[in-house]
Structure formats: C-alpha cells, structure tokens
Regions:
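Membrane-helix boundary/helix-loop-helix interface segments in multi-pass membrane proteins
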Residues: 1-101, 163
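Residue-level signal for short amphipathic helical patches enriched in basic/charged
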Residues: 4, 99, 107, 148, ...
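Hydrophobic membrane-targeting signal helices
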Residues: 5, 25-26, 119, 139, ...
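Short helix-terminus and kink motifs of transmembrane alpha helices
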Residues: 7, 68, 106, 127, ...
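Hydrophobic alpha-helical segments of polytopic membrane proteins
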Residues: 14-20, 81-99, 104-144, 155-156
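Short, highly charged low-complexity linear segments
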Residues: 31, 54-60, 121-129, 152-153
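Hydrophobic, glycine- and aromatic-enriched re-entrant/interface helices and adjoining loop segments
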Residues: 36-44, 129-168
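Alpha-helical scaffold segments in soluble metabolic enzymes
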Residues: 65, 69, 114, 152-155
C-alpha cells in the first residue's frame, strides 16, 4: 500500500462502497443458500481457493469513501439534510449489513471510523451527537437481545465471571 497514490483512490471511492455493499450481501446470501441458519455467522466469502473477510473490505471502503465525501462535500457538511444525512445513510447501510453477519464489533468500529472522519471533516458536532445518541438507543437493545451477547458485554465491563464467558 505504500506505493499507491492515495489521491487516485478518490476516483474509486464510490465504486468501492458499491462493491462492499454487494459483497456483504453476497456473503449472507451464500451462507443462507448453503442451508445455514440466519443467525449463523457469515463473515467469509469463499471464492474457489480464495476467501475474503468482507467486513475488512468494507472497513477500507468506508475509510476511503468518507474521506472522499468530506473533501467533495466540505461546504455542505454542516447542513444535515444535504450534507451529513447522505453520508450517514451510506455508513449505517454498511454497518447494518455487517450487523446481520453478525459482527457487532466490526460494525461498531466502522461506525466510529466514519463518524470521526465526518467530525474531523467539519460536520456539526451537535448533529453528530444526536445521531450518536439515537444510535445508542437503537443499538443497546439489539446488543442485549441475545443472552450470549449480554454475558460477553457484562464480562467485558467486569460484571460477570471473567474465566467463563469473557475468556477468549
């Protein structure tokens, strides 16, 4: 990656996001087509002798796309409807596709990366704070909806048996 001119990545940013959405959807569809249940983790896309962890490609794509978007729409970023909302819709779409894999930690990290780029790029802090608050209101019940996830979260914060559920 040291030899890649980062300025040339701007041209590919929209295509990278589109490609990421396609492969994230394809990953889940392939696992469902193979007869696995909806809740079975579907994080790898196997293409013959090759395998891809599609969320890693999505992470790279979000980083490139958000940087591209901030540069392209810098003057509109303070406006929620015309500047911030389109970027958030793309970000949350990618995050949602990763959550259904299910891979909550990667979705969370991608969200943090995207929000930080938007903030550094000049997005309104109060608007980002409202979006973050709303995301927590939606995200916490989803995270706590399954017993094993709730136990892992509680063990992470030291509220559970560390030798059992929290051991990795």
């Amino acid at each position: 990656f040291l030899n890649i001119d980062y300025r040339s990545l701007k041209k590919t940013a929209p295509y990278l996001i589109f490609f990421s959405i396609i492969i994230l959807i394809a990953t889940k569809i392939v696992f469902l087509a193979k007869g696995f249940s909806w809740s079975k983790p579907a994080r790898w896309l196997y293409l013959g002798p090759f395998s891809l962890q599609t969320s890693d490609i999505a992470r790279f794509s979000v980083l490139i796309f958000m940087s591209y978007y901030v540069e392209k729409k810098a003057e509109k970023l303070k406006n929620f409807r015309n500047g911030l909302l389109p970027a958030l819709l793309i970000l949350f779409s990618i995050m949602g596709l990763i959550v259904i894999q299910p891979d909550f930690s990667t979705a969370f990290m991608i969200g943090i990366i995207g929000i930080m780029i938007l903030f550094i790029g000049g997005a309104n802090f109060s608007q980002l704070s409202l979006v973050g608050s709303f995301s927590l209101l939606v995200g916490i019940p989803i995270l706590m909806s399954r017993d094993y996830r709730r136990q892992r979260i509680l063990s992470y914060f030291g509220f559970s048996n560390m030798e059992d559920v929290g051991y990795q």
